[in-house]
Structures are given as structure tokens and as C-alpha cells.
Amino acid sequence: MTQASLTLSFFLLLGLPQEPTRPLFRVSTEVVQIDVFVGKDGKAIPGLGRTAFSLYDDGEERDIEIVDVTTVPLDVTIVLDTSASVAGTKLRNLQSGVHAFIDGLEGKDRAALISFSQHVSLRAGLTSDRAELHDAVDAVSPFGATAWHDALFAGLKTVEGATHRPIVLLFSDGDDTYSFLLDEQLLPLVEHSDAVLYAITPVERRPGPGTAFSAGREQWLSFQEQRSRRTKLLRTLTEASGGRLIETESVGRLQQIFVELLAEMKTRYLLTFEPPHPIRQGWHDIEVEVNVRGADVHARRGYFYE
């Protein structure tokens, strides 16, 4: 079976279109909701009120409201690289991290699990059944190449239309070597999705000038070039969605990272506003500011209205 047919068969299994066209960041009942993280020195800043925020829609300041995040559960799709390079200690640390993340989910929070090598597999759909999720994590095994582009698309589709707060959490340790989707196709997918994207990637030092084929760029690249391109692409995608890229030099920190990210997800702010009528169709730029000196603000850069 060819690379394209492997990917296509998974998309058809989920009832997804072959071409990733127009998954929308939807404006429900003409109210726009922006998921925002505010931090300083790597730590969340909780307890900010409405007056601490300024939100600009196409350069115009809007009146905003803050939704109590404790009343809106999480819908998190966890997308795990299980290619051959993850075998051994790395996989054990990865599984421990995901188990800890699942244990930290509360109440009506839901999670889904997707694993990928050159195949993309939906291990568990969105569920609040912790036992099902733990079993799905234990069932993964490493083999094959890496198709994280296609897996990210599947993760975004899994939370599309979610009634809770949609988040995709991606782990990958390598450059894409097998996907149907190319680098330049990913940013429009993320911008049109309503999900916040987080990504975790190890920073590995490989000796020598070795090369490997990059499916995402359709060319041969050195390991250093691959790492640089992957990091740049992941940072672009996560920042566009209002999420973050986490790089780690130690896979032994994965459990801590997963736990910290779940805590961060629970301390984000939900801002809402109503655009003035008539609402122009197409892309609208969003900028969020806070009146806290030195604070970092992570929020999506805009929304589509159709």
C-alpha cells in the first residue's frame, strides 16, 4: 500500500475529506471566543479580571467578557509519535507522561488518543472514561516512519465541533518522513481550526553530518536542518493557535511537562466578544493585551467568519 493510500484510508475511516479544505474556526451565534494564556517567567498569572485585558478586532477595541474556565471542561486530543525512534526509554517516559496527564483530568473533561508512525491510528475517541484512555496508552508500540503532519490534521478534526474547550497536544521527536500533507498546508489548517495547539519535541544532539528525507519539504536534509525546520514549523503553528511549543533535552522530564501543561490549560482565560454587524466575511485579525508588566500573552491571531 502506498504512502498516500495509507493516509487516505485513515481519513476515510474517520469520514474526513481527502483534501484539508476549510475546517472553520466557527463563530457560534456570532459570539467570538478567544482562549488566552497569560504568564510571566514561565508561570501562569491567575486571577486577572476583565479590565486587565484589551482585545482588538481588526484594530478596533471590543467590549469583552470573561467566561469562568472552571465551568467549561476540556476536550484534549493527545497525538503521539510512536515511530521506531521512540522505542525504549523514550516510549516509557512518554507513556508515563500521558498517564499522568489523564490522571489529572477532572469531571467532564474528555480526551482522545491518536498514535502515528507512517500509519495514523485513532486509539480512543473523545471520552471521559479514564480506564479506556489508560488502556489505549498502554497499547501503543513503536515502529516505522513519521507522519506527524497527517496526524496533526486528524487531531484537529477529532476536536472539530467540540462542545468543550478544544485542545490538541502533539508529541513528536522527528521530522516528517511520510505524510501526505506538506509543511505549507499546515498553517491554514491550524488557523481555520478552533483548537489551541501545544507541541512537545525533544532536542536531540546527533553526531556527524547524517541526512534523511523530509517528506514535508520533499528533499534531503541534514539532521540539524531537519531539527531546525521542525522546531520553526511547530513554533509557528502553536503560536498561531494561542498555544506553545515545549522543547526538552531530557525525555526524563516528559511526565513533569505533561502535568505542567495540563495545569496551564486549566489556568487559561476565555474571552468573548460580539463583532459589530454586519460582520465581514473572511479573516479577522485579533490582538490581545494585558496590563501586567512583562507578561507573555498567548492567543490566536485571528478568526474566520463565514
PLM segments and residue spans:
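Bacterial N-terminal signal peptides
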Residues: 3-15
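Scaffold/interface architecture of coatomer-like assemblies
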Residues: 15-306
